[in-house]
């Protein structure tokens, strides 16, 4: 763990109870993982971190290079991220910092920066081979006029409530709709459906976090010759899809083969899902090996 530049073990890493990230959820974060010991798509994650912080009028006190150094320092201390045998999960948290009990941003003179590193744990083989179950939950995704979903905020109550409902129904992920009833995203991932060989995902206008893996899959699909497009989706588009899958940084492409009690398509991971998943994994390996060579 790294708290404001100092490395601690988990038992001794602390932040103040007066940190506004703790008091008010006032902060942003990014989650990354390594492939071949390299933080994957680091630059894109940092761009999103800065976009999120800008919307909160929160300064990022470090350069991307400094943040990368802190990640590597923390990975080294944890004995992780040296190669394929010990890949790392990385979370970077930026908060308003320590201040008085006040919503006034001026109450916090210095932002807090925390880096958490632990071993990367991939989903089970069964999740990739048989697929996971989704649940259409009643919790509505944040309205952009309140807490904009474009902000990857430390305040995750909206997602947590949706995940609680999904978990009670035995689902792996909850599918959230926006205030218009359109599908937005899942609780911790972006959603794609496949129809007639085309992978479709809701546009940002449907009120979702711009996932790094989601965006990268457009590039992966183009290289693999698989159409990947944005489209407004509703419940029936998911229920009547040929295939479906979810994407996230730590999981890549995970097939979804069931919604509540209904099978999606044939009820097994489909060819488009498998092809995109394989192409994504191959591209991740290629890019991180190139980074490793340049570093050497």
Predicted regions, residues:
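Conserved alpha/beta cores of soluble small-molecule-handling proteins
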Residues: 1-175, 179-182, 209, 218-296
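Glycine- and Gly-Pro-enriched alpha-helical subdomains that act as flexible
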Residues: 174, 182-204, 210
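Secondary-structure junction motif
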Residues: 213-214
